[in-house]
Amino acid sequence: MANITNEFMGHDMLAPFTAGWQSDMEPLVIEKSEGSYVYDINGKKYLDTLSGLWCTTLGGSETRLVEAANKQLNTLPFYHSFWNRTTKPSLDLAKELLNMFTANKMAKVFFTNSGSEANDTQVKLVWYYNNALGRPQKKKIIARAKAYHGSTYISAGLSGLPPMHQKFDLPPPFVLHTECPHYWAYHLPGETEEEFSTRLANNLESLILNEGPETVAAFIAEPVLGAAGVILPPATYFDKVQAILRKHDILFIADEVVCGFGRLGTMFGSDKYNIKPDLVSVAKALSSGYMPIAAVLVSQKISSVILSESNKIGAFCHGFTYSGHPVACAVALEALKIYKERNITEVVNKISQKFQEGLKAFADSPIIGEIRGTGLALSTEFVNNKSPNDPFPYEWAVGTYFGAQCAKYGMLVSSTGDHVNMAPPFTLSLEELDELIRIYGKALKDTEKRVEELKSQKK
């Protein structure tokens, strides 16, 4: 048995989203995956309720994806897609994605390696498009507070999370942020969901008018805000937002990185909320996380301008060495085949009711303000006195403590501040779901006790 403390403490990695003090702690080193479970280097088994990072939808041991990678590695391990050269897996995957996305007619696919790169690409596409139309001033992008769109320069700027901006000179001046559509947290007394949506839509239009519609190029949104805590759009929100965007000739970018490929019980979040985007970003579940790959879906409206005008203003000079990597594309293509064959949205809908109802049964806990979710995505918000305006003291780290208790009992969740996210793989069995609910309950009981102790110490 390996000794984590001796072997890995003070390790050589500069880890993502990790503070310096954490480098002196024992890291959790994951060594093996099997179905809905992962195992650490000491052999401890954990139910992985975040699908890695929202991505391993088909679980950790789907042999068909491994075989697809192996077959492609033995045929053509790499070739690029520059200068009108490409590979068959990339062409086949592009065609399949265009057929699969039906919320609006898409015409072209551009491959990247991550959701961050996809959203960076979206902004460059929008800028190129407006330059091609002779509108160089139409460049600003509107995103939303609390949104997560990635961590590269542009995508981190689009993200509405202050810790991602601090010390990085972000957001850039061309990025604007409008309000987060979290009804529970931000509605006024007596305000209905539809009235809340109307107020936010009116504020969005005021922002556009104040900036000048001729300067605003696009609006980017996740159908459901994932990392922010599975924040669902309030009633009529996207209908009202899209009407404003059309009125002012502003493009809609749908960030489907988390929501896409069945997570919400529909193939895409755009299907669930009647979104008709001009551009779409997909990643994560595209390959079930087995290979790094993402894609940008481009509507006919935009692609026709780019293709026709590039002969006049110059080529769309953007791309990555690994854009359309043949192995990643082969794995993604097999994942999409599995989603179709297994009718994955039906699978999600069959287990999501018990998942949602089983966990929302804990909503009466005195330390929980809201449990919200849809499909196989759910978030628990810990607050004092069940009020969004009364958070626990930061140093109490209530969400972090809950996550640590879950890990102690053999379950991994994502704890960000005092909200805890769960997005389990679609392979989750009913027995595993029972285990998930049981561990959640045990960890919650421990956390309630911990909060009571902290409150008594404060008196």
UniProtKB/Swiss-Prot annotation:
It catalyses: vanillin + L-alanine = vanillylamine + pyruvate. Involved in the biosynthesis of capsaicinoids natural products, pungent alkaloids synthesized from phenylpropanoid intermediates in the placental tissue of chili pepper fruit acting as repellant on herbivorous mammals and conferring spiciness to hot peppers. Can transfer an amine from vanillylamine to pyruvate forming vanillin and L-alanine. Keywords: Aminotransferase, Coiled coil, Pyridoxal phosphate, Transferase. The modification N6-(pyridoxal phosphate)lysine is found at residue 284. Changing residue 259 to R: In strain: cv. Himo; altered activity leading to reduced pungency of sweeter fruits producing preferentially capsinoids over capsaicinoids. Gene3D superfamilies: Aspartate Aminotransferase, domain 1 (3.90.1150.10), Type I PLP-dependent aspartate aminotransferase-like (Major domain) (3.40.640.10). Residues 430-457 form a coiled coil. Pyridoxal 5'-phosphate binds at residues 115-116, 255, 320-321. InterPro entries: Aminotrans_3 (IPR005814), Aminotrans_3_PPA_site (IPR049704), PyrdxlP-dep_Trfase (IPR015424), PyrdxlP-dep_Trfase_major (IPR015421), PyrdxlP-dep_Trfase_small (IPR015422). Changing residue 210 to K: In strain: cv. Himo and cv. Takanotsume; altered activity leading to reduced pungency of sweeter fruits producing preferentially capsinoids over capsaicinoids. It is an enzyme of class 2 (transferase). It holds the Pfam family Aminotran_3. It comes from Capsicum annuum (Capsicum pepper). This is Vanillin aminotransferase. CDD domains: OAT_like. GO terms for molecular function: adenosylmethionine-8-amino-7-oxononanoate transaminase activity; pyridoxal phosphate binding. Pathway: Aromatic compound metabolism; phenylpropanoid biosynthesis. Its EC number is 2.6.1.119. Confined to the placenta of green fruits at high levels. Barely detectable in the pericarp and seeds as well as in the placenta of mature fruits. The keyword Oxidoreductase does not apply. Belongs to the class-III pyridoxal-phosphate-dependent aminotransferase family. GO terms for biological process: biotin biosynthetic process; gamma-aminobutyric acid metabolic process; phenylpropanoid biosynthetic process.
